[in-house]
Amino acid sequence: MSNKIRKGFTLIELLIVVVIIGILAAIAIPKFANTKEKAYLASMKSDLRNIATTQEAYFADFQVYVTGGASNVGGATGTTLNGFVPSSGVTVSSTASGGTGWTATSTHSGTSKTCAIGVGMTPPTPATVEGEPKCTP
């Protein structure tokens, strides 16, 4: 009788490894999807903060906010707001009221959520605090 040394993995060991990889993937994939959504929302909020900065700079110079509305602010088909250019995939719409206040909303092509900000006027939904961007849940 000869003693053969068997090398390699058994079928059970391979199945256990596959199950562990499956569990790790099931945990990781939703986390990555959520990260993408957070990045879209951060981009939209950043653009709204940039509009706020642009509006405040204009107000510091002329004691009024930029008046008139604009759809797709800074976009190829929209009105430029003092050189503001939105992030890729973001569309920003702005309205103003007689130079004493303004509101802006932003959307992203990668999500159905909307973010908004306002100063000197009733903030648009979902914004609730003046000057602070907020997004729909």
Which residues are covered by each model-predicted region?
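Periplasmic/extracellular, small/polar-rich flexible segments of pilin-like filament-forming proteins
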Residues: R49, T53-P137
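Compositionally biased non-globular segments, especially hydrophobic aliphatic-rich helices
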Residues: E13, A42-K45, V73, G131
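Aliphatic-rich helix starts adjacent to a transmembrane/signal segment
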Residues: K31-L48
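Hydrophobic transmembrane-helix microenvironments that flank and shape a buried ionizable site
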Residues: T10, M44, A52-T53
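Conserved short hydrophobic patches within well-ordered secondary structure
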Residues: N3, V19, L41-M44, A104
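N-terminal single-pass transmembrane signal-anchor helix
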Residues: S2-F32, K36
